[in-house]
């Protein structure tokens, strides 16, 4: 079991604001000292989500900040995210844990 996440946990969501892109939000947050970044976009096409999430994942790795993907276990695995955040209608926890492995965050 992973330890609890503490500190400032940022969720990038361009559906609740349209002034900044996911990437701009992540860059500003990293510069500001954020502790965790979660990529969240429920409407984006898979190929576009992959490109953006992969870029943010690399930025987070360089900054030693955990990167979480919202809802999408497939995307989390594809970009080697540190974890996945599951909602009520997403893949069941047991299956997500099996796919993600014991060293990743599943919540």
Q: Where are each of the predicted segments found?
A:
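Conserved N-terminal beta1-alpha1 strand-loop-helix module at the mouth
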Residues: 1-91, 98-106
């Amino acid at each position: 079991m992973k330890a609890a996440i503490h500190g400032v946990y940022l969720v990038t969501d361009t559906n609740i604001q349209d002034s900044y892109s996911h990437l701009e939000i992540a860059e500003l947050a990293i510069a500001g000292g954020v502790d965790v970044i979660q990529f969240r976009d429920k409407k984006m096409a898979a190929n576009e989500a992959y490109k953006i999430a992969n870029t943010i994942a690399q930025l987070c790795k360089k900054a030693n900040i955990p990167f979480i993907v919202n809802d999408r276990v497939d995307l989390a695995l594809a970009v080697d995210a540190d974890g996945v955040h599951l909602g009520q209608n997403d893949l069941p926890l047991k299956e997500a844990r099996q796919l993600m492995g014991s060293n990743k965050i599943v919540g």
